[in-house]
Design a protein with these regions (language model features):
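Glycoside hydrolase catalytic-domain context in secreted enzymes
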Residues: 1-686, 692-708, 712-713
Length: 713
């Protein structure tokens, strides 16, 4: 390959660059390829990757035509017949394909604590993405949800490193399968490597300050697990850590990712991020220097995505001048071609939707509904208010009650998720689903998200109801448009909540939101709190079934739900992070804790057993517990194992999740659940940035059962 061809493989453009536009510069719908623009990019500049949709979701035949045209040009009109690698953000289903199955978002999938659900959802997503003729998916997000202000919090698996690592593995397994040449699977992309998810301000793409030890302890492990699972690509963090943009950080991109983790795939930038080294981060005085910095640091592919000529010309010149070695170029291109070969794109550059007859079928809808059911978290149920009798008169109010938008969130049919009501018109809003379950349902919105509409009307209607279903939360958003100044739920919604409480009727609060908006002003006054996060297209039905008692809720919180805006502490905090003002004793008082969540069945935990209380070396600690369903309904239960290190050279966390299993129990049934731990499971990163095990005393805890062990060297 010539240098120009190699640089082309490292260049990624957005579909908008090569489609036809009208006289006003708007993309023609449905989108069509502009042959002249396409040939300039693919033939003249040898561009190797195309991404994105054309503003909104496309039907299968449109995707088929677009990608067939692109691939035919790449395979027939370029010297080496190298296929294009087409990528898409299909983060909770094939969300840019009309009619596809849209699952709960990642934060809601995390609430299931169910590896199999996550894997199955990913496998169906892969199937429907390949039905769209697309072989590469920009998912999963493996950043840690430890900054609840962040506008991409809902794209994470929550705040716990172990949970994110395990569910990340499951999602990659579902996406990639065992054979990527099987055209029902896609290449996964772990993102956003590394540290992107904890900006100090809480605002997207703003700087993070994360000490190296914490970076390795909390933020690196999910990416390490993904590499072990065989993930093929990674997208790089758009922000900076400790003053250095990650796109220019050779230690993180080459030293850790490619050498220490032995990552074999390639690293792609996020949107325009090489440009931002010059225009936003101000570490590169010119665009030329920005390209040099990024490629030398270890970037293999640039999501340009518009000015591809400039990127290519600058990189070619940098190689010719010796400022970027051809060896670095060869490494990048080898990695890119490796992924294309693993996907079998030379043999099957195009997949045809006619061969995917399961697309959006009943089997996939059933899987989606089960995921949504397990994602809903019952956090409060005073006096067993739920389930409601279906003969009761229900009044429904709030901004999230009658729209598909808050059920799905961002990355749903369009970038910001604002068109879900248009594209998902055949799906049920929560209000519509409640009307299916209950005979007598009335409705008044009361407020928009942040402004009052008709609170007095809502209060009057509520007075004649048996119960109020109060639907609060957030509209859809993604990335920087979702930045907020305050976690407290908007004042208009607070006023609506107060008005409903004043009626004296039982209030069932439903929260549809992408991050934990603070509700402490009225949380103590409502009888029920159901947190659904972003449960997807089947979320309305799942919530309604839980309210009516058809389904027993089983979700658990994958993050700490704060009580106060200035007390954002994770469950695995150090004891010194939560001290009282007086004697310095621990005080951790969130609205709800990580792992909280109840059902209609009472689960009794007994007989916590250990095979040994004193262990040495590479021995295995075997832990078991008996769980009995004391209720009258079948129920699912997420069993969580926590470990506390009593003393360590680095201040230990008060507890850490080290195992979880999801089980199903019939009424009266007892199951024994077992876990195994090795020394490595109790290791941590020390002050020298080495992962070490220190012998000593530990406690293992499942629910309220706790036992202490000693582990010697």
């Amino acid at each position: 390959m010539t240098l120009e061809e190699k640089v082309g493989q490292m260049t990624q453009i957005t579909l908008e660059v090569i489609v036809k536009k009208d006289i006003e510069g708007e993309i023609i719908r449905p989108p069509e390829i502009d042959s002249e623009k396409m040939r300039k990019a693919l033939v003249d500049y040898h561009v190797g990757s195309v991404i994105n949709t054309s503003g909104a979701a496309n039907p299968l035949p449109v995707w088929q035509k677009l990608i067939t045209t692109i691939q035919n040009t790449a395979m027939q009109e370029t010297p080496h017949h190298i296929p294009i690698l087409y990528g898409i953000d299909a983060i909770h289903g094939a969300n840019y394909t009309t009619g596809a199955t849209l699952f709960p978002q990642q934060i809601a999938q995390a609430a299931t604590f169910n590896r199999k659900i996550v894997e199955n959802n990913a496998a169906i997503t892969a199937y429907e993405v390949r039905a769209s003729a697309i072989p590469w998916n920009f998912s999963p997000v493996l950043g840690m949800g430890r900054q609840p202000l962040w506008s991409r919090f809902w794209e994470t698996f929550g705040e716990d490193t172990y949970l994110a690592s395990e569910l990340g593995r499951a999602m990659i397994k579902g996406y990639q399968g065992t054979d990527l040449k099987d055209t029902t699977h896609v290449a996964a992309c772990m993102k956003h490597y590394l540290g992107y998810s904890n900006p100090r301000t809480g605002k997207d793409r703003t700087p993070a300050a994360i000490p190296d030890r914490e970076l390795r302890q909390y933020y690196l492990p999910p990416f390490r697990a993904a590499v072990e699972e065989g993930v093929l690509t990674t997208m790089v963090c758009s922000g900076e850590i400790n003053g250095t943009p990650v796109h220019a950080n050779k230690t993180i991109l080459t030293g850790i990712l490619k050498k220490e983790l032995d990552f074999k795939g390639f690293a792609v930038t996020d949107w325009e991020d090489i440009i931002y080294l010059h225009t936003r981060h101000k570490v590169a005085p010119t665009m030329r220097e920005a390209v040099k910095m990024a490629v030398n640091a270890g970037i293999d592919m640039s999501m340009v995505p518009f000015k591809y000529e400039e990127f290519a010309d600058l990189l070619i010149d940098l190689v010719k001048s010796g400022e970027v070695s051809e060896e670095r170029i060869n490494d990048a291109v080898t990695r890119i071609l490796y992924v294309k070969k693993k996907l079998g794109l030379w043999e099957t550059p195009i997949t045809h939707y006619e061969g995917y007859n399961k697309f959006a079928g009943d089997e996939f809808k059933k899987t989606n509904l089960e995921a949504a059911r397990e994602a809903v978290i019952l956090l409060k149920n005073t006096n067993s208010t739920l389930p409601l009798d279906t003969k009761q008169k229900i009044f429904v109010t709030g901004p999230t009650a009658n729209s598909m938008v808050p059920l799905n969130g961002g990355w749903s049919y369009n970038w910001q998720g604002t068109r879900a009501d248009e594209f998902a018109e055949n799906e049920q809003t929560l209000l519509e689903a409640l009307r299916d379950q209950f005979a007598n349902v009335s409705y008044e919105p009361g407020v928009d998200y942040d402004k009052e509409i008709s609170i007095s009307n809502a209060k009057r209607k509520a007075a004649s109801a048996d119960a109020v279903v109060l639907c609060l939360g957030e509209s859809s958003y993604c990335e920087t448009p979702g930045n907020i100044e305050d976690l407290v739920i908007p004042e208009a919604q607070q006023k609506l909540a107060s008005a409903m409480v004043e009626t004296g009727k039982p209030v069932i609060l439903i929260l549809l939101e992408g991050r934990p908006r603070i509700v402490s002003h009225f949380a103590d006054d409502v009888e029920v709190i159901l947190l659904a996060n972003l449960p997807g297209n089947m979320g309305g039905r799942a919530i309604a079934e839980i309210i009516s008692g058809k389904i027993n809720p089983s979700g658990k919180l994958p993050y700490t739900y704060p009580r106060f805006a200035n007390h954002l502490v994770t469950y695995d905090h150090k004891g010194t992070q939560a001290l009282t003002k007086t004697d310095g004793s621990p005080e951790f008082n969130p609205q709800f804790e990580f792992g909280d969540g109840m059902g209609y069945a009472a689960f009794d935990y007994t007989n916590l057993s250990l095979n040994k209380r004193i262990l040495e070396g590479d021995e295995t600690l075997e832990i078991s517990v008996d769980i009995t369903n004391q209720g009258k309904m079948e129920g699912k239960e997420a069993v969580l194992l926590f470990v506390t290190d009593h003393f360590a050279s680095i201040t230990p966390a008060v507890k850490q999740l080290k195992g979880f299993q999801k089980i199903t129990l019939a009424p009266g049934e007892t199951q024994k659940v077992s876990f195994s731990l090795k020394q490595s499971d109790l290791s941590f990163v020390n002050k020298d940035l080495k992962t070490v095990f220190e012998p000593g005393a530990f406690s293992v805890q499942i629910e309220q059962l706790k036992k202490e062990i000693q582990w010697k060297k």
